[in-house]
Amino acid sequence: LLDRLTEIMQLDREQRAVIVGAGNLGSALVGYSGFASSAFRIVGIFDSNFSKIGRMLWDLEIQDAERLPELNRELQASIGIIAVPAAAAQHVADLLIAAGICAILNFAPIHLTVPDHVTARNVDFLRELEILSYHLDRPRCLGDGAASAQ
């Protein structure tokens, strides 16, 4: 059963991904050690800041985001990860789609408009924190923080 699920989710083959945004979040994602033991491989990092383009980040050279459609012909990424401010996220999504990428993980706090053949998933840190905040209203968690757990 596990083998069949792995096959259905396409985790039995390498899944190539690019990250757009070489700031704090993008840098952390490129260096995430969990990718080493997964099917996912980060094959490119892109940014629009000319002072970052050409620099090395881990073992990847930061490329100009505007060149993503051209460079993905060689990289062959099928997943794009957006780690840019909200104001730039839709443009980045458009670049990813122009590059032939049909699966997008979006960390920007904005809803993306994508064609029907593209799947976009949003990671909303604030919403997740709100959910955690709701769960704090449990008897053991009421009180003054860590001291109430004792």
Listing of model-derived features with the role each one plays in the protein:
Residues 1-99, 115-140, 150:
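Hydrophobic, well-ordered beta-alpha structural blocks that scaffold small-molecule cofactor pockets
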Residues 84, 107-109:
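Short secondary-structure boundary segments
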